[in-house]
């Protein structure tokens, strides 16, 4: 990696990339998602949970309808607790820009009794991804990071920091 200068400490990132940068800086060692059949979001969340039980910071990413599929392990995680922090990144789609419904994942956070963070721009997306691990480990619970279409695809300035 080239040496950073004062000018390169800030860069333009879309929201999704900012989350990725935040996960990296926070020391996330495993990211799982739903790559296609025959695996499912259930498998992805259970993989992240297994890593968490081993003390590894992990993340699972899915879109909002995938959270329906992963509801069983989500509710189990909420009462079994975690060892390494676990962040569940969920992409909601208000206005149905690229999905089949307008489901609101905030209802899952309430029902499962897990904290949810909802960034409003790229800088918050990065910061909240990092903060989610701290909350997860401090309170022994998974944390949902709710992204929506507009925040995921809009660009903003983020400050680059070193990995922990």
What is the predicted role of each segment?
Residues 3-13:
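Active-site mouth loops of central-metabolism enzymes
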Residues 11-42:
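N-terminal glycine-rich anion-binding loops that anchor highly charged ligand groups
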Residues 40-103, 107-137, 148:
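Thiamine diphosphate
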């Amino acid at each position: 990696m080239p040496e950073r200068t004062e000018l390169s400490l800030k860069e333009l990132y879309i929201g999704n990339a900012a989350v990725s940068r935040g996960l990296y800086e926070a020391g996330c060692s495993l990211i799982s998602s739903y790559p296609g059949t025959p695996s499912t979001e259930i498998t992805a969340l259970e993989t992240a949970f297994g890593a968490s039980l081993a003390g590894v910071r992990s993340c699972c990413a899915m879109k909002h309808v995938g959270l329906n599929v992963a509801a069983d392990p989500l509710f189990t995680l909420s009462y079994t607790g975690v060892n390494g922090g676990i962040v569940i990144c969920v992409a909601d789609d208000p206005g149905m820009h690229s999905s089949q419904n307008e489901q609101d994942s905030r209802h899952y956070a309430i029902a499962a009794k897990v904290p949810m963070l909802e960034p409003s721009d790229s800088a918050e997306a990065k910061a909240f991804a990092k903060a989610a691990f701290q909350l997860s480990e401090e309170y022994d619970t998974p944390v949902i990071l709710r992204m929506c279409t507009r925040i995921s695809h809009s660009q903003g300035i983020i400050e680059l920091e070193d990995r922990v």
